Regions:
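A short glycine-rich, Lys/Arg-flanked "PGG" loop and its adjoining helix->strand segment in the class I
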Residues: 128-139
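Class I SAM-dependent methyltransferase SAM/SAH-binding core
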Residues: 51-105
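A short SAM/SAH-binding and catalytic strip from SAM-dependent methyltransferases
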Residues: 114-127
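A short acidic, Gly/Pro-enriched loop at the edge of an enzyme's catalytic core
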Residues: 104-115
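Conserved beta-strand signature within the Rossmann-like core of class I S-adenosyl-L-methionine
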Residues: 141-148
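N-terminal, positively charged/glycine-rich alpha-helical extensions of SAM-dependent methyltransferases
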Residues: 1-20
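Conserved alpha-helix/loop element of class I SAM-dependent methyltransferases that forms part
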Residues: 30-47
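C-terminal alpha-helical "lid/dimerization" subdomain adjacent to the S-adenosyl-L-methionine
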Residues: 8, 149-200
Length: 225
């Protein structure tokens, strides 16, 4: 289980990076973020209400809104500067609303057909996050988590380590991203989020499946009621 210190990294990593996030996540994943978001969307077959946790600048939130134009989509994030960008970039959507809140602590009156979270799991306590998601899920609802994983294949892991080292070097030249690009590789290497969340989802009565993406550089975990 990750400690509270992992969650405390969020403001250190992201408070000053909202306006540049979209570009950095594209180049920082070698363009794979768009592919990963597409794979997340493929896990969503239908629904009238969606909750996107750690929505950031609203990249995934807007993609869900585009796929389900008649649905209600709520995005939650703990960082105000990111929500400011999300709201600005989502002006053309009338079915999206954003809330400043903590993914582990939010309480809403609504329940949702699907709850998504990309790049969030490694920062949270699995027991707390899953319990809160289940409490906001409809009877036939589905949870979809996505995050980085540390590749198991030695050859792929070698390339991944090289790329993470490159990101650390890049971070030294971008002041606002220095903490994130230096700290994230360490967090990714030590995180066992996929195993932890799989166990907790199963204990909460969810049907669990997972899918590795890009040779194990990230993964999608689903839990369905």
């Amino acid at each position: 289980m990750l400690t509270e210190s992992a969650k405390n990294l969020v403001p250190k990593f992201f408070d000053e990076t909202g306006t540049t996030y979209d570009g950095v996540v594209t180049y920082g994943t070698l363009g794979k973020d768009k592919y990963w978001k597409k794979k997340i969307l493929q896990q969503i077959s239908n629904g009238n209400s969606f909750l996107d946790l750690a929505c950031g600048t609203g990249i995934l939130t807007r993609k869900i809104a585009e796929k389900f134009p008649n649905a209600k989509i709520v995005g939650i994030d703990i960082t105000k500067s990111y929500l400011d960008v999300a709201k600005k970039n989502s002006n053309s959507f009338d079915n999206i609303s954003f809330i400043l809140d903590d993914a582990e602590e939010f309480k809403l009156d609504s329940k949702f057909d699907c709850i998504t979270a990309s790049y969030l799991p490694k920062y949270c306590d699995p027991e707390i996050l899953v319990k809160n998601c289940v409490a906001h899920l409809k009877p036939d609802g589905k949870i979809i988590f996505h995050d980085f994983t540390y590749p198991k294949n030695p050859s792929v892991r070698g390339l991944w380590n090289f790329f993470l080292t490159f990101l650390r070097l890049v971070g030294c030249f971008i002041p606002s991203w220095k903490d994130a690009l230096i700290g994230l590789p360490k967090l990714i290497r030590r995180s066992k989020w996929l195993d932890s969340y799989s166990d907790v989802m199963g204990k909460n009565g969810l049907k669990v499946n997972h899918q590795y993406l890009t040779y194990g550089a990230s993964a999608i975990l689903t839990g369905a009621k």
